[in-house]
Amino acid sequence: MTALVGGVHTRRGFAIRTVATCAALATAIWLSTQLHCTPALHHAALLIHLASLVLGFGAVLAVDYFAVAWVLRRTPLREMLTVADRLQLPIWLGVTGLVASGVLLEPNIANHTTQTKMALVVALTLNGLQASAFTDRVAAHGGILDRPLIARGALTLLISQACWWGALWIGFWNTTNHV
């Protein structure tokens, strides 16, 4: 899932993934303005959206739990890294499912809260790409982490949580207020 050369994450591979991700997200936003769904398809998309939220955010919460457990010295670094690596697939399947089903939910992109949610989704996706590169770097350090690396990990976790919870709250708000 990540481009490694001698245990070091390549900048070119990261840049390619970042550009491809931004292009995919921009395409999804554009498609959401072009597609019009039947009520049955809308309901199916909502179910997929909720299932993807459970899958992706649940996996993120598990990874973050192990990260906090490592900081509190309740679990070894190797176990935290193993969990983070193994949960990459459900995280990215969840994010992909959220974006794909979100296209079919006909978001009101003129609404400021919807625009904020889309910005949060872009931020959490780019933060997720950066988090993958970060865990590769941590693994390459062999368990010896300096303060800047620990600070980067904490910031990654905080950004992740803020984006996921923010997008979740806005989605709930928009749905209950029929925005």
Show which residues each predicted segment covers.
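Polytopic transmembrane helical bundles with strong interfacial aromatic enrichment
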Residues: 2-179
